[in-house]
Structures are given as C-alpha cells and as structure tokens.
C-alpha cells in the first residue's frame, strides 16, 4: 500500500512537471509568434520536412542499404575487416574482430554492433571492459555512409572525408575513455572474459549462396538491403519531424519583413541568441561563423537524421561552408543520436548501470571529433593556399 502511494505521488509530481514544461514551451512560442502562426508553422515545417527531407533521406538509406548488403554478400566487408584488423589493438585496445563492427555500423546504424555482440563466438574475443566499450565504439561509426553521402550531395567532397577522420579520432577518445571508466569502477573486469570460454564445434554447412547464380545473389542482396534501408528511413521520420521542427523554430527567425505569417521555417531565434553569448567558444573550437550552426550538434545528440534535416535550411540561408560540413560530418557520425540509443544498447548486453559513464565518454568523444575536424580542415585550406602559388609559377 505504501509503495503504491509513493508511486502515485511520483507520477503526480512528474505529471505536474510535464504540464509546466509544455505550457512554458508553447506559451513562449505562442507569445512571440502568435498562437495561430505558431500552429501553422509547426504543421507546415513538419510537412515540408516530410516531403523534401525525409523522403530524400529515405532514398539515400535505400541505396546505401543495398550497397552495404551487396558488400556483405560478395565479401567486401570481410576484406575490409581483414584489412582493418591490425589497427584495432594498438589504436582502440580492442580485439581485431571489432573491425567488423565498425564496418557494419558504418553501413547501417548504431544497433548493428549489438547484433554482433549477441553472438557468443564474437563476444568470446573480449574482456568485459572491452566488451562494454563496444557500444561507444560502434556508435561512433553509426550511419556513417548515409552522413557522408548526404554531405557530398550538398556539393562538398573533401570536407566529409576530413569529418570521417575526425569521427575516428573521436571514436578513439570515446572508446578509451569508456574503458578507463569501467576499469575504475570494476577493476576485476580487466581479467574477466565477456563470456565463459566454451569450445564451439564449427559445423560445416553448405552455403546456400554457392547454389545460386551471381545474378540472383546480386538481386537478392540489393532487394534485402534496400528493404532494410526503408526500415531505417521510416525509423528516422519521428526524429526529423518532431526534433527538427522544434529546433528550427528555436533557430530560425521571422519573415524578411520581421513579421510572423505562419509560413514554414519561421521561429524565435532563441538558440542563436544564446550561442551569441559565448560565440567565441564555438568559433575557436568548431570554427562556426554563424550562431545558427550550433543547432546541428544539439540535434545530433538525439537523432542524426533530424540533424541532417537542418542542412538544407542552413544552405539556403548561406550559413554553411566547408569547415561546417567537416565538423557536422565528424560530430554527426560520432554522436549519431547516442542519447536515444545508448541506454537501450547497454541494457541489451546487460550493463544498464554503466549508461551514465558511457554517455559522458561519448559526449567527450564527439567534442574531440568536431575540434579535430575543424583544425584538420584549417590545415587543409592552408595547404591549398600554399600549393596554389607554386602551381601558378609552374604554369607560367
């Protein structure tokens, strides 16, 4: 009886906080924009995002999903795994088989690392502290192919590659930091195996794909991969429509004449106003020359698909440059909505209590990724400027 009373009290308290938060949020927007304009802007922004951003992202998901499945079917993933394996131990302090997880999450999404972790033969290569850090390692490459292809579609090619290198640096920081946190909390995990040592008899099974022609294997791989891409595309719809809509309303301003008319992509410019107060921090760390750009990393904390939905608006306003694309690629890949997936991922492998440590480590990793990408892009620009006079002198 006492427990029920406590539970009902906590529910009442959380209900009050929820009502207060909703009233403050919509009250502030309605007070600045006007309630009819606010409602029209919410609906029109979400509708435009669905038609012009979500469907575009879904098409990329379908194509990249098909390519990824073809790579798996014809051994390209296995080849990449063999190539990357020697780098795992010295750089990430992880067994060589972990490289397969990097490739799989890069081609799909964060949870792909968990499907591998559930495989006991895969997990048998790890000590417990290494096994737990897999969530951070895999998340840093989540949806990497989608992010890079999307950025390249905006007309930038060198910047996404620099961002990929930055994401790798952030991954090293996040993974190593998580391992330190785990060992500090549970020193015994340094020697304990992730799963008990068991001798597994490998059964030689006649592979079905050897009985099929190359054309059928290619067709099946493309269709299955495309179907998985549709699933990813559908999964990002709530994040893009809900998170991006409200982030845009706190990022963009009124119409050109300074009034609100209920059109899409209007807002109160609260985030840029706050970012302006500490703009020197964002400019030095990330090279952001416009305070509106801070909306991308904030959104990427919860959903990278929603963060990508902000890019077309930034481009149309002229806020984007190569440096921003490099930083967005790095932080978008590294964070890739980890706040919405980390808890479930750690819970699925049985270490829910370590979620706060994993989140802290990965937050730091994302910052390292962004800062690294910014300074690498600055170095890239300086090298281009140095080489241009030399090239002109050679021509003359």
Regions found by a protein language model. Give the residues of each.
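Intrinsically disordered, low-complexity non-transmembrane regions of multi-pass membrane transporters
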Residues: 1-11, 181-227
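Alpha-helical transmembrane segments and their helix-start/interface "positive-inside/aromatic belt" motifs
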Residues: 5-18, 227-239, 356-358
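Hydrophobic core segments of alpha-helical transmembrane domains in multi-pass membrane transport
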Residues: 17-30, 61-68, 166-179, 240-251, ...
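Long, highly hydrophobic alpha-helical transmembrane signal-anchor segments
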Residues: 26-73, 145-163
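Transmembrane helical segments that form the transport core of multi-pass membrane transport proteins
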Residues: 35, 64, 69-81, 214-306
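Membrane-embedded helical hairpins/re-entrant loop segments and their flanking transmembrane helices
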Residues: 67-100, 118-123, 282
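C-terminal transmembrane helix pair
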Residues: 112-177, 304-383
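Single conserved hydrophobic/aromatic residue that forms the stacking wall/gate
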Residues: 384-396
């Amino acid at each position: 009886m006492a427990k029920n009373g406590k539970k009902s009290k906590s529910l009442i308290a959380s209900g009050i906080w929820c009502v207060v938060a909703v009233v403050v949020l919509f009250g502030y927007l309605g007070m600045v924009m006007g309630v009819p304009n606010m409602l029209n802007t919410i609906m029109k922004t979400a509708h435009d995002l669905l038609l012009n951003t979500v469907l575009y992202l879904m098409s990329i998901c379908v194509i990249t999903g098909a390519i990824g499945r073809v790579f798996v079917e014809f051994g390209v993933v296995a080849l990449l795994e063999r190539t990357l394996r020697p780098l795992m131990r010295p750089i990430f302090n992880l067994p060589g088989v972990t490289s397969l997880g990097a490739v799989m999450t890069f081609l799909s999404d964060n949870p792909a690392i968990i499907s591998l972790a559930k495989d006991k033969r895969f997990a048998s290569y790890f000590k417990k502290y290494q096994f737990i850090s897999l969530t951070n390692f895999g998340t840093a490459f989540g949806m990497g192919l989608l992010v890079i292809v999307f950025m390249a579609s905006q007309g930038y090619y060198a910047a996404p590659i620099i961002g990929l290198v930055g994401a790798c640096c952030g991954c090293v920081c996040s993974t190593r930091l998580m391992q330190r946190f785990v060992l500090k909390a549970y020193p015994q995990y340094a020697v304990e195996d992730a799963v008990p040592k068991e001798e597994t008899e490998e059964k030689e099974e006649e592979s079905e794909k050897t009985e099929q022609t190359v054309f059928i294997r290619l067709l099946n791989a493309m269709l299955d991969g495309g179907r998985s891409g549709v699933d990813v595309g559908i999964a990002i719809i709530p994040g893009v429509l809900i998170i991006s809509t409200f982030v845009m309303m706190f990022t963009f301003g009124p119409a050109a004449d300074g009034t609100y008319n209920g059109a899409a992509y209007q807002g109160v410019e609260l985030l840029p106003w706050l970012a302006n107060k500490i703009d020197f921090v964002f400019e030095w760390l990330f090279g952001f020359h416009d305070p509106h750009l801070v909306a991308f990393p904030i959104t990427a904390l919860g959903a990278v698909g929603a963060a990508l939905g902000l890019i077309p608006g930034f481009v149309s306003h002229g806020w984007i440059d190569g440096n921003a694309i490099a930083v967005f690629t790095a932080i978008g890949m590294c964070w890739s909505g980890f706040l919405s997936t980390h808890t479930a991922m750690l819970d699925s492998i049985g270490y829910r209590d370590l979620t706060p440590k994993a989140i802290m480590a990965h937050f730091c990793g994302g910052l390292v990724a962004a800062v690294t990408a910014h300074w690498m892009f600055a170095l890239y620009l300086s090298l281009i400027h140095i080489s241009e006079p030399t090239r002109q002198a050679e021509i003359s």
